[in-house]
């Protein structure tokens, strides 16, 4: 069973005045339900078992992983990295981590899961409305308390591994505190794919994700907030990239 949080229909304020691609504005949103947690390895495993699906990283052998100690922003291609071994085979696989968010999957892989499950990815606006949880601003919490809510990189840089919160990469979903409407990990843990395009998109292969990840820190990335929007290739498979699902809200009976 997937636990859902209902977001009522209405007009919501999104964006920020300083963002060209996500300016401050009001958007009309239909009622929808959003998964309380990010999609897990266990749920993705069920999908693969039922369908025999093969992910982009498995086909192309170009999963992207981060190696602490290299350059600050350096991600490397690892032929052994895919959703079974999201950080490469040498670091072990998902055994014992079935309640962690699935990673090293592409936007296309996430869409394939959604088609099988009869759900969809949140739109850019839906994601932000849910992430804000009724708050108005870049963060739904006091920025000084972010590490109570988000699995993010705690070190000053990426030159040394950081386990100050007990997690070098992903954490089990629901480990940290939820946002005001009960969603877990909307900041940190993994970036979450969203449907929709931005005005600045110049290529058909561009897709978007939000919320930041375990890799993000104050000095790099810093996307663990409600307003920033990341861009990724439709086939790219990173070890800090996952997704959350939504469905249209059920109409009340009577």
Where is each model-derived feature located?
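Low-complexity, Gly/Pro
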Residues: 1-2, 43, 114, 216, ...
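Functional-site microenvironments in short loops/helix caps that host divalent-cation chemistry
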Residues: 6-7, 13, 17, 54, ...
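Hydrophobic pocket-lining residues within nucleotide cofactor-binding pockets
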Residues: 12, 32, 39, 214
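C-terminal, low-complexity/hydrophilic appendages and adjacent surface loops
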Residues: 19-22
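A short N-terminal beta-strand-loop micro-motif at the entrance of redox/enzyme domains
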Residues: 26-31
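Short capping motifs at secondary-structure boundaries
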Residues: 32, 46-56, 117-118
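Short, solvent-exposed alpha-helical surface patches in non-cytosolic proteins
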Residues: 36-48, 106-112, 128
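Short, structured beta-strand segments at or near domain termini in extracellular proteins/domains
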Residues: 239-252
